[in-house]
Amino acid sequence: MLSIIIITKNEEEYLPRLLKSVKDQMYKDYEIILSDAYSIDRTIEIAENYNCKIIKGGLPSIGRNNGGKVAQGDLLLFLDADVEMPKDFLNNTV
């Protein structure tokens, strides 16, 4: 399994596009961990709609480390919220 760890703080503008691009992946054996640095916008609500595991984080190393600590996957993929992946990205990478 792949653990996708996303570091966020007030990312409501970008996060939906990233999470949609993850959902649309051909590769499906993953979990999404959102390591959030106390967002005050809709970031958490958006992540909940995509069934992300939400944890307290920080920017950037604390958030990445916190995400890695709870990850269940054998592989870790760290992403920023403004990333969008083509549908075959995980299939070709993992």
Predicted regions located by residue number:
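N-proximal low-complexity "stem/linker" segments adjacent to membrane-targeting elements
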Residues: 1-21
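Short, acidic, metal-binding catalytic loop of nucleotide-sugar glycosyltransferases
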Residues: 20-29
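Hydrophobic/aromatic residue at the end of a short beta strand that borders the catalytic acidic motif
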Residues: 79, 83-89
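Conserved short acidic donor-positioning loop in nucleotide-sugar-dependent glycosyltransferases
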Residues: 22, 36-38, 58
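A short, amphipathic alpha-helix embedded in the catalytic core of nucleotide-handling enzymes
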Residues: 22, 89-94
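A conserved acidic beta->alpha catalytic loop
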Residues: 36-44, 83
